[in-house]
Amino acid sequence: MREKRCWKGRLIGALALSAGWAARVQAAPVLVDDFNTGEIKNLLGNRSNVFIKAPSKAMVSFREDTVNGKKSQVLMVRYDKRNSGGPFDSGGWCGYYTLLKSPAALVAPTEENPNPDPLPEQYMDGSRYKMITFWVRGEKGDENFVVGLLDRHWDKIGDSVKSEEIGKYLPAGKLTTDWQQAKIPLDEFFLDYSQLASVAIVFEGDLFPETGHAGMIYLDDLALE
């Protein structure tokens, strides 16, 4: 009987230890941006903006809308993706990005250290998150894009690992004029999750293979969960 109680005690202790380990591994969701500040800067304090290469182009602005039953300020991304002209006659590129990494920063000199080294850039440790989530809708419902994610390696190269087309991660199977929450598992991106640099909305040329495409999408509540 005593041996049985000891075995039960060890089992309960192991389960408690396992539960505690799981609790440490699962990080609380982090809201990267809710777009309510009206600034081209996310809630992490890092830069956000469009990226463009002519002849393609993109711009962002803010709009009032109702998302999931709540009034909210949302991000509008307007794009015009061309399929010819520019480098390699590929039509250039365009999209929107927001930084997850904190950029390098200067350090104020002191009497003791008049020439301090700058603080290095700090990549986000996303290894305890499981997915990227955000709310999205299209202006007409015929829009399309992929999500790009960068770690330190891809950040240095200046490119990203891409998701599948956004419809794969939406309840309706495609963008519509209604708000839907996209849920993109991080394991869709084969990279170093402990050194995340940025996340991007990318309008790829092969999404619109015939003539390119111009349109508008709206985003809200971009998060890591």
PLM regions: where:
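Bacterial N-terminal signal peptides that target proteins for export
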Residues: 2-12
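Coiled-coil-like amphipathic alpha-helices with heptad-repeat character
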Residues: 3-5, 19, 42, 58
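Bacterial N-terminal signal peptides
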Residues: 12-20
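Sec/Tat signal peptide C-region and signal peptidase I cleavage site
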Residues: 21-27
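Beta-rich carbohydrate-recognition modules and glycan-binding surfaces
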Residues: 27-225
